[in-house]
């Protein structure tokens, strides 16, 4: 089976999986556990998330979100992670480049039967124009196509 790690992908047998064996055959989103350490703004905050293949695992290089019922739900989760509001809320709890589970404490759960946009989230939570402008001045758009941040 494939294992996603910091130096690329590797392969191991299922018997070598030590933790969270029950997640191996589920739909999951992998989020890099370390983001850019840059102090410049606007900032990316998190590395690019991706949907892991069923039957895969990851090293501690990633934080796992899930399991989810379908690949479509995973893609909707990624649309949420991609929003500036999501990453702004993470930034409030992320004093270093490490993005471990605790940095997601301020991020509210959503209905992942649909994709999310910042405009929808700003309206849902009643953010003012000033609040939106502040968030957008602090958080860089996340482009999920190719390359690094």
Where are these regions (language model features)?
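Polybasic, glycine- and aromatic-enriched phosphate-binding surface used to engage nucleic acids
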Residues: 1-115, 120-126, 131-149
């Amino acid at each position: 089976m494939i294992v996603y790690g910091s130096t690329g992908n590797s392969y191991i047998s299922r018997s070598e999986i030590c933790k969270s064996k029950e997640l191996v055959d589920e739909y999951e989103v992998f989020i890099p556990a370390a983001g850019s350490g840059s102090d410049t703004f606007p900032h990316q905050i998190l590395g690019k998330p991706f949907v892991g293949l069923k039957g895969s695992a990851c090293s501690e290089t990633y934080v796992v979100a899930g399991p989810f019922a379908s690949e479509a739900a995973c893609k909707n989760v990624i649309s949420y992670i991609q929003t500036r509001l999501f990453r702004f809320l993470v930034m409030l709890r992320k004093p270093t480049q490490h993005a471990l589970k605790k940095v997601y404490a301020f991020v509210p759960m959503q209905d992942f039967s649909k994709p999310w946009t910042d405009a929808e989230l700003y309206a849902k939570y009643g953010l003012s124009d000033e609040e939106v402008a502040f968030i957008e001045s602090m958080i860089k758009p996340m482009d999920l196509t190719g390359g690094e941040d």
